[in-house]
Amino acid sequence: MTTRIDLRGLLPQELEELAVRLGEAPYRGRQIFRWLHARRAKGIEVMSDLPRAFRERLALVAELPPVRVLNRLVAADGLTRKLLLGLGDGNSIECVLMIYKDGRRRNTACLSSQVGCAMGCSFCATGQGGLQRNLTASEIILQALALGAELAEGEGGNRISNIVFMGMGEPLNNYEAVMKGVRIFEDPSGWGISHRRITLSTCGIVPGIERLAREKPPLELAVSLHAVTNELRDKLMPINRRYPLEELIPACRRYAEITGRRVTFEYALIAGVNDRREDARGLSRLLRDMLAFVNIIPLNPVAGSGFKGVPPAAARAFVALLQEAGLEAAIRDSRGQDIAAACGQLRFASREVL
């Protein structure tokens, strides 16, 4: 049995090539792209400006797998929602929608890049189940479609304004599919999301950061740091044993210099572990004279980790120390803790729900 092509994961030029192979003019491919990513078509049969005969030929070789929402959780504030999505092979992934009703009216989609994660960070739930596989570009797009459908008309329609690759998985270990997704999201004839509104978060894959610096894809870079010494970072984030700070920080500096874009460093404050004054001073020294911003993250509870967060006053004091040293820093708004949708809490919930 021949596997049909999943249209959502194709770039405009790939859809144009498909149209030509099926005996149509290239512009038909761009029409298909608009149906998929501007009109959010759920089936080939609704693409009414395509000739019926072409739609019939297309349906023989291509498909649009349905969005399968297995579970849906809404935070008490109603503004954070977590979806468990079923994939065609029986695996499942989680993604999160965060609605901000401030002056900028942002609707942020937090997307997964892998089923599970191989990084094994000690304070993160995702890695507890290990890595199953990479997601395809289509499966990445599917998450945004599902989250966009969550938005009511009064909340900006189904317009996703921001994309963050901060869900399950390490995006730089699924580089090709993630970058393909980014290019689809950025295309003005579809989602039309500016590169300033697409953020990729990595635990510190140095070759991937160097590739980002060379290729300059349309996105912003965030790096999960969480410690200022190799000794501590080795314990918190095993990837540091492969790419220690003396390799990671210079790679980030080069990225900032080459692209002209600042690097955001994420730092989860863990009580009694990385929250001392000397940690703040070490962080200031590490990032001195770099185009950088520090996001201080309130640690979110993860069963079995043994870690605890710090009181809000302590987090504010830590930020003040960084700012006094000349670093740009702020406390990141943490959303969705009550539905395990916050940073570090996504996992194989399907084992608990189904």
Curated annotation (Swiss-Prot):
- GO CC field: cytoplasm
What is the similarity comment for this entry? Belongs to the radical SAM superfamily. RlmN family.
The EC number(s) this enzyme carries: 2.1.1.192
The record's active-site residues are E94 (proton acceptor), C343 (s-methylcysteine intermediate)
Q: Where in the cell is it found?
A: Cytoplasm
This protein's species is Moorella thermoacetica (strain ATCC 39073 / JCM 9320)
Cofactor(s) needed: [4Fe-4S] cluster
Q: What does this protein do?
A: Specifically methylates position 2 of adenine 2503 in 23S rRNA and position 2 of adenine 37 in tRNAs.
> Where do the Radical SAM core domain residues begin and end?
103-332
Look up the further comments and give them: Reaction proceeds by a ping-pong mechanism involving intermediate methylation of a conserved cysteine residue.
Q: Gene symbol?
A: rlmN
The name on file for this protein is Probable dual-specificity RNA methyltransferase RlmN
User: Main localization of the protein?
Assistant: cytoplasm
Superkingdom of source: Bacteria
Q: List the disulfide bonds.
A: C110-C343
Instruction: Give the record's cofactor note, including how many are bound.
Output: Binds 1 [4Fe-4S] cluster. The cluster is coordinated with 3 cysteines and an exchangeable S-adenosyl-L-methionine.
Cite the binding residues for S-adenosyl-L-methionine: G169, E170, S201, S224, L225, H226, N300
| GO biological process terms, semicolon-separated | rRNA base methylation; tRNA methylation
User: Which keywords has UniProt assigned to this entry?
Assistant: 4Fe-4S, Cytoplasm, Disulfide bond, Iron, Iron-sulfur, Metal-binding, Methyltransferase, rRNA processing, S-adenosyl-L-methionine, Transferase, tRNA processing
Which residues are [4Fe-4S] cluster-binding? C117, C121, C124
Q: Which GO terms describe its molecular function?
A: 4 iron, 4 sulfur cluster binding; metal ion binding; rRNA (adenine(2503)-C2-)-methyltransferase activity; rRNA binding; tRNA (adenine(37)-C2)-methyltransferase activity; tRNA binding
